A protein has these predicted regions:
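Amphipathic alpha-helical segment used for protein-protein interaction
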Residues: 3-35, 45-53
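DNA-recognition helix of helix-turn-helix
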Residues: 33, 39, 48, 53-79
């Protein structure tokens, strides 16, 4: 029984660990990038909808989303 407890305590849910790391990556983004990333990725809004919500030009949002994706990739690779 002790061995089972020890083995169970060493169990790592890698899917959950990756999800936590992904959330940490998102939280590390500058606010503007984080907002556009969340609205685009999670809420699946198009740039025109996000533009109306944030009062920001769609072109600017596209740039922010691009940089957000790059920073998330970098975070996931290096941390």
């Amino acid at each position: 029984e002790l061995m089972n407890k020890l083995m169970a305590s060493d169990y790592v849910d890698y899917d959950n660990a990756m999800a936590v790391k992904f959330q940490q990556a998102i939280l590390s983004l500058p606010e503007k990038q984080r907002i556009v990333f969340n609205l685009r990725y999670y809420d699946e809004l198009d740039y025109e909808e996000i533009s109306r919500i944030t009062d920001t030009r769609a072109e600017t949002l596209k740039v922010n989303y691009h940089y957000a994706k790059e920073k998330i990739k970098e975070y996931m690779t290096n941390n």
